[in-house]
């Protein structure tokens, strides 16, 4: 099961009171519902690919209106796609859609009733229904954090974004496949949205995975940085040894001033140690790291002069 499916499964298990159940059902029907005729009577079909969401729609209708509906299963044969589930309401359709402020003549309204936007719990419930109807969220294991809600109607999409942004979540909108989406890209905002709509367990899982992933990335960066520093130190030490050996072969280390000769001989004897360790090994030491570095730079410069024939 995908992470998005786990989130939706958790949401379908939330117990809601009548007012909030109404707001959630309002979103589910507005986004996934269609009106038809059967035997000269109006029917409502609400379609989903999730059996859990189909059961949720069925339960909400029964809870609010004490009306039974049918759940139909349509099998998709092509490409082994998921089945489609249709919750079909045959009785009291106009009354129920009127109560939900969804029906406009024989069409579903795009706008959400303004009185809904004044109640915090109803907004959260509506957003939960909207996510169940058209939402998806990337697995936090991936490097691309993304949560979106798809809607057929531009005005409805803008209103969903407005609801989300009441909670400072920086939701944005764009066009998508003959429809519209509202989306979140920031991990912290996605986690806050999941908590907002009631997916607390999924939010905690999201945060745990994200924290572990971020820590792993930080460790990798530190290791890479440490490896780069070690390579840099090793390359510098190799260059120092090569230059000291050149000096020894050309003019002999005995020709060097005492302090330079001491550091040169110590470096040849301890080629892999750091500058700090080298300073503790020099006869007559210890010498500070900066002091060791200063003397080695002098040896490097002297070796370069020997290569150019300037110091002989």
UniProtKB/Swiss-Prot annotation:
Keywords: Cell cycle, Cell division, DNA-binding. One of its GO terms (molecular function) is DNA binding. Pfam families: HTH_WhiA, LAGLIDADG_WhiA, WhiA_N. Residues 274-308 bind DNA. Gene3D superfamilies: Homing endonucleases. InterPro entries: Homing_endonucl (IPR027434), Sporu_reg_WhiA_N_dom (IPR018478), Sporulation_regulator_WhiA (IPR003802), Sporulation_regulator_WhiA_C (IPR023054), WhiA_LAGLIDADG_dom (IPR039518). Involved in cell division and chromosome segregation. This is Probable cell division protein WhiA. It comes from Limosilactobacillus fermentum (strain NBRC 3956 / LMG 18251). The lineage of its organism: Bacteria, Bacillati, Bacillota, Bacilli, Lactobacillales. The gene is whiA.
């Amino acid at each position: 099961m995908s992470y998005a499916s786990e989130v939706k499964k958790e949401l379908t298990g939330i117990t809601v009171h009548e007012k909030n159940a109404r707001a959630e059902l309002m979103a589910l029907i507005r986004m996934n519902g269609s009106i038809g005729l059967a035997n000269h009577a109006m029917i409502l079909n609400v379609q989903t690919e999730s059996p859990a969401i189909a059961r949720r729609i069925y339960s909400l209708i029964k809870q609010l209106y004490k009306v039974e509906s049918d759940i139909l299963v349509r099998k998709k044969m092509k490409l082994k796609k998921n089945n489609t589930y249709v919750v079909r309401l045959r009785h009291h359709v106009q009354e129920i859609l009127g109560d939900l402020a969804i029906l406009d003549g024989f069409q579903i309204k795009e706008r959400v009733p303004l009185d809904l936007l004044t109640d915090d719990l109803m907004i959260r419930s509506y957003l939960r229904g909207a996510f169940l109807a058209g939402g998806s969220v990337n697995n936090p294991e991936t490097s691309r954090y993304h949560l979106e809600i798809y809607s057929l109607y531009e005005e409805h999409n803008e209103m969903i974004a407005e609801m989300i942004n009441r909670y400072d979540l920086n939701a944005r909108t764009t066009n998508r496949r003959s429809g519209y989406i509202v989306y979140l890209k920031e991990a912290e905002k996605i986690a806050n949205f999941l908590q907002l709509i009631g997916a607390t367990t999924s939010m905690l899982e999201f945060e745990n995975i994200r924290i572990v992933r971020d820590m792993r990335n930080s460790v990798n960066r530190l290791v890479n940085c440490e490896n780069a520093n070690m390579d840099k130190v090793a390359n510098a030490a190799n260059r120092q040894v090569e230059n000291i050996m050149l000096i020894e072969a050309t003019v002999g280390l005995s020709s060097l001033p005492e302090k330079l000769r001491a550091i040169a001989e110590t470096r040849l004897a301890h080629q892999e140690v750091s500058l700090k360790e080298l300073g503790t090994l020099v006869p007559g030491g210890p010498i500070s790291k900066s002091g060791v570095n200063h003397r080695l730079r002098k040896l490097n410069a002297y070796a370069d002069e020997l290569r150019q024939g300037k110091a002989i």
